[in-house]
Amino acid sequence: MIVLFTLLRWAPISPVFSMRTMHANLAHRGIFLPVMIVTLPLPVHLRRRFPAQMVLMLQWFAFGMFSVLLIIPWLLCVYRLVTHSPGRTKRIKQVLDDRTAPKTVVVMPVYKEAPETLIRAIDSVVDCDYPANCIHVFLSYDGCLIDESYLRLIEHLGIPITLESYPQSIDVTYKDARITVSRFKHGGKRHCQKQTFRLIDMVYADYLERHDNLFVLFIDSDCILDRVCLQNFMYDMELKPGSKHDMLAMTGVITSTTDRGSLLTLLQDMEYVHGQLFERSVESSCGAVTCLPGALTMLRFSAFRKMAKYYFADKAEQCEDFFDYGKCHLGEDRWLTHLFMVGARKRYQIQMCAGAFCKTEAVQTFSSLLKQRRRWFLGFITNEVCMLTDVRLWKRYPLLCLVRFMQNTIRTTALLFFIIALSLITTSSSINDLPVGFIAISLGLNYVLMFYLGAKLKRYKAWLFPLMFILNPFFNWLYMVYGILTAGQRTWGGPRADAATADEHTSPEEAVELAKAQGDELNVDLTTFRSRGDEKSVPIHPSEKIDGRFSAPELPDGYDSNLNDSNAALTELMTPLPSVPRIGIHTYPSSDSILTSDSLSSIHLPLKVEELTGDNDNMKPYPDRQPRDTSSLHQMQRTCSNGIVASDSCSSQDDASEMVNKPEILSPSAHILPHPSQATESSSGEDIYPLHLPSPHQHEAHFAPLNASTRGSMEGNTPEVQRPRRKLPGIPRPIRAQKDPESMV
């Protein structure tokens, strides 16, 4: 009845989605209909209508099916835990250095996060037991505002806060690790990741031509990495003895942390441990994990580059299809995993690393938890249907698809024990009616596993698993019902503007553009898109073009054939001007991510801190650190308390363009062409890479004096640009030895 009610509730919103879901659910749930009949505490006058022989047969059928569906995944999990022991132990015995450690790019999207939380997350990355010169953190703000939190963060990293304007991206060296702080136009997490990917692709284009050992780690801004997280990832993906170097993606073990303990946080902690180390261990044993969470996912960048077009594709033209919205927006991590599973050439290329741990902040309130689980449920159900109806996945991962199908059928019995408990409390049933076999197998096997994991990881809260076993089915039912009742609302919660609607004068595409102008492209009213949704439907499965896409053959000269074959190369689209030198850019940069229709904003290569403060400052001796002069920061904070300090339009990037492209007044003998990294600008629709030549008629940029409270090591990470600048007063710096060029990449 619950399933039929949910399907009927969904039907008015999206007929396409309801039909797909109905077929899948009826096939899944019908298998366990006998289990429901013989297990539910039905009234006596109904039970008398069933012959005793039939009830006995159904009971044995239910017991056998239930045992198989629990024991087989449990045995697979035990096998995985034995062969890949979980724990925060160091897997690599030798000491890694700048040449033996693969380069790792850490992408951290930021949206309205407290500076203290960000600093804690950044410190956990740069303090890892991993060569700092091989770590490059991309701290990407989803929004262009320069507010107090932004200023406090960059001041902590060592970037001056007294500048009149700030470029879009700034490079700084913090604890010997390279950090790029960027601000992009607000468009959501996936849009922020997309813009960051474009920036990474520009910075590392030449490096990727020769190497395939660049990895990208996606984490959330509130995550705290374990000290050996990075090197354990690299051990399983690249450095393990006998490795074939073909691992495409891995996820780790995410646990929760909180400052205030409660029943909700306790249940979340046990659920994280059980879900990470049980379900994903089973999936890894079967060929691939089905979810690469955005909170902790390591990808091989060359593989991610090939999927960028499909993962970052614009969905405005498909917004009327609710199924596509849930699949690609609410469940973007599951959708990315699906793309990788289809693109992989063989099994066991998408795995879980049982030695890579991180902590994330647990949700404190029930309302926030309800909204979070609503997103998870809608993203899960759409991608699950997509996966189980994709023939390519059944051929490549038969055991995985079979196990997922079995686990979906067993979800029907999730509320059985809760209903049985209610029947015992209300005395409508006796203790003799309890299905002891079901309880012994389900609770017993899971508790043995959780007891072992709690002792192994020293998370003794896992020993309270029986509490989760009783309460979690009820909470999961609430999440499901709430997700169904609010399925038509395309918003992530919180204060929003009025939802955009479509009518006879406004198409769904125009409604989405209106929502974008209001600051949230997902805040639209789906119920007004029904007529358009009946006319066409979005393909449920990924394109056939990505099947087996992850294969980069090596060329005879030793170069990797990492071609971006889905679109024309950028260099083929450029027509160089006469007597203008060609920009030194990789022949095949990822034009997929740059030429998409919503990428109207220019992406600028990051500026070094020295270029904001003067080139000659680093030639002066560095005195002892003086007490911090916080007058400038206090003045800026007072301005922030009255409102927004500064903002710029990311579509035009006035400030960034001024900082990147404004040349200085040159002497008659100094006719120096700006470095390509400072004269490069990508956009869609106009000249892709215009060169801005220095003009003696343009004025010199004016900067405020450098504050003495600047922290961090402001060391450059790109080739030095020799341009005369006005000498500014600043903190004297020591003469540093030039680093090896490869270690700076």
From Swiss-Prot:
Root EC class: transferase
Segments for region (Disordered): 613-635, 672-745
Gene3D superfamilies: Spore Coat Polysaccharide Biosynthesis Protein SpsA, Chain A
InterPro entries: Chitin_synth (IPR004835), Nucleotide-diphossugar_trans (IPR029044)
Membrane topology designation: Multi-pass membrane protein
Main subcellular location: membrane
Name of a matching Pfam family: Chitin_synth_2
Segments of skewed composition (Polar residues): 707-720
Family, similarity comment: Belongs to the chitin synthase family. Class VI subfamily.
Name of this chain's protein: Chitin synthase D
Annotated source species: Aspergillus fumigatus (strain ATCC MYA-4609 / CBS 101355 / FGSC A1100 / Af293) (Neosartorya fumigata)
Lineage: Eukaryota, Fungi, Dikarya, Ascomycota, Pezizomycotina
Gene, per the UniProt record: chsD
